[in-house]
Amino acid sequence: TRADQVMQALIDYEDTRQVLAHGQTKSSVVLKNALQVDLRFVDQDSFGAALHYFTGSKAHNIAVRRLALDRDLKVNEYGIFQGEKKVAGKSEEDVYASVGLPYIEPELREDRGELEAAVKGELPWLIQKEDLCGDLHVHTKDSDGKNTFQELAKAAEDMGYEYLGIT
């Protein structure tokens, strides 16, 4: 299968130093640069539940599971279940809706009041790429960057930046 091929490619990757786990749906390796890479394959109808599970902090996931229990639901990386029946999980929005919440952005999933804010409709606004006015820390070829000053200046102009700081 395609999943098997992708898993094997990770195991065989030239920068893989150590294989921690290797199976049909999950593989974990440590790269030569000491970075751990975890690769999971899930069914399409479980993708949202898996994405939610792996992008939230442990504390956030526990808090969501508590809300689910109040509704006689179980939440895990495979979906939202009522008894043995899967009732949601295709999208992250499904996960939150199943426990009575609006979608919560991954950046907020820390169990630091985001669930309470979501209930009140008071989730904070997050900075978007189009909100950026410039970049104060870029490098050119003259140090350890990959582009010339002119290329960086042109890219900054193309992105609508008002300023660019070359360090």
PLM feature spans:
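An N-terminally biased module of ancient metal coordination in phosphate/nucleic-acid-related enzymes
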Residues: 1-2, 114-167
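Acidic, metal-coordinating catalytic segment for phosphate/diphosphate chemistry
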Residues: 4-130
